[in-house]
A protein has these predicted regions:
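Alpha-helical scaffolding within the catalytic cores
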Residues: 23-28, 52-59, 90-93, 161, ...
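Glycine-rich anion/phosphate-binding loops
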Residues: 50-54, 85-89, 152-156
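Short, solvent-exposed turn/loop segments enriched in Gly/Ser/Thr/Pro and often Arg
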Residues: 46-47, 72-75, 108-117, 172-181, ...
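N-terminal export leaders
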Residues: 1-3
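N-terminal carbohydrate-binding accessory modules
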Residues: 7-70, 81, 96-100, 104
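Hydrophobic faces of well-ordered beta-strands that scaffold small-molecule active sites
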Residues: 38-42, 69-71, 105-108, 172-176, ...
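Polysaccharide-binding and catalytic clefts of secreted carbohydrate-active enzymes
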Residues: 132-299, 303-315
Length: 322
């Protein structure tokens, strides 16, 4: 489930990784006047409730002092129930009701939850664990960032959303995906294997350079061609994988995530009003997350859960507010 509140990360901040690159996006007050920096918002999922309840709920939210709401991040199956057949009338009504009661809307792209027909028709879009098991439809974040086919379907649905709501007066901004990160699961699908080899070739240029950097003369690991390289996996080797390969794996994953988010930001920019901002909400403990690489949004946000997250490795109170 999504968090109650997204808090913009003030910028610029300095990247603390070894990369000689700074993190700099638009100042937060460019999109939010100072008096609105701590506005209270809430996600609302109209697709989960009988439509007769929507007006009651949104009216009560407004009366409670909530200023904005998020829509649509998990609703791809409602928007495109069949391939190429779109239904936005229900979302039009939800946006109109929010506007009626003075609630601003953050529109979200529904890319963490592709519809069942898509993975049924094209199982090659699914991510795969290192034991060879593909992650199936039924929850979320099961489609591969490395799948060109999946990205084409993402482009279609994001373009449709942007063209429909990119100039709506109630829509103040856009959230790309939701907590992108595959829960830290590494994708070992054939799409990811191929993209990893391309990434390595672009980084190192020659296989000799890769061998030298990875220290592959140890244990006769030396490669003669990039096609021989696979994503490092504990399942495929009797001992721990090459640590240099693991480092490149993490960097590759971060680039794939960033490329997926940046691609959507570019699509949105082509259609939305210049006053509508673009963000995504991150979970920092997911391995692929590197905010430095996500640089096509206006700012980044960090999901904080009010009473959970104590077991996520960032301190006993790491996810709590205050």
């Amino acid at each position: 489930s999504a968090a109650l509140i997204d808090i913009p990360i003030p910028g610029p901040i300095t990247n603390t990784s070894l990369q000689l690159k700074s993190f700099s996006q638009s100042p937060v007050d460019k999109s939010f006047p100072p008096e609105e920096l701590f506005a209270l918002g809430s996600y609302y999922y109209p697709e989960q409730w009988d439509s007769s309840q929507w007006e009651r709920d949104l009216k009560k939210m407004s009366e409670m002092g909530i200023k904005f709401t998020h829509f649509a991040e998990f609703a791809w199956a409602m928007m495109e129930p069949e391939e190429g057949k779109y239904d936005f009338e229900w979302l039009d009504r939800a946006v109109s009701l929010a506007e009626k009661y003075g609630l601003k809307v953050i529109m979200c792209t529904p890319t963490p939850t592709p519809p069942a027909w898509l993975s049924k028709k094209y199982p090659d879009i699914l991510i795969q664990r290192d034991n060879g098991v593909s992650i199936q439809h039924g929850r979320r974040q099961h489609a591969s960032w490395s799948s060109d086919r999946y990205r084409r379907y993402v482009e279609n649905i994001v373009s449709c959303l942007a063209m429909r709501y990119g100039n709506h007066p109630a829509v103040i901004g856009w959230q790309i995906d939701n907590e992108p990160g595959h829960y830290g699961v590494v994708d070992y699908s054939e799409n990811a294997q191929l993209k990893f080899r391309v990434w390595l070739q672009k980084k190192y240029g020659t296989i000799d350079k890769l061998n030298d950097t990875w220290g592959t003369s140890f244990w006769s690991e030396t490669y003669q061609d990039f096609d021989q390289v696979r994503l490092p996996s504990q399942q495929e080797v009797p001992d721990k994988p090459n640590p240099h390969a693991m480092l490149d794996l993490n960097r590759f994953m971060a680039d794939e995530l960033a490329g997926f988010v940046n691609m959507q930001a570019d699509i949105l920019r082509r259609h939305i009003h210049k006053d509508q901002w673009i963000t995504t909400n991150l979970i920092p403990v997911f391995n692929p997350v590197d905010p430095v690489r996500i640089d096509h949004t206006d700012f980044l946000t960090y999901t904080r859960y009010l009473v959970t997250g104590h077991n996520q490795g960032i301190g006993s109170q790491g996810f709590r507010m205050g």
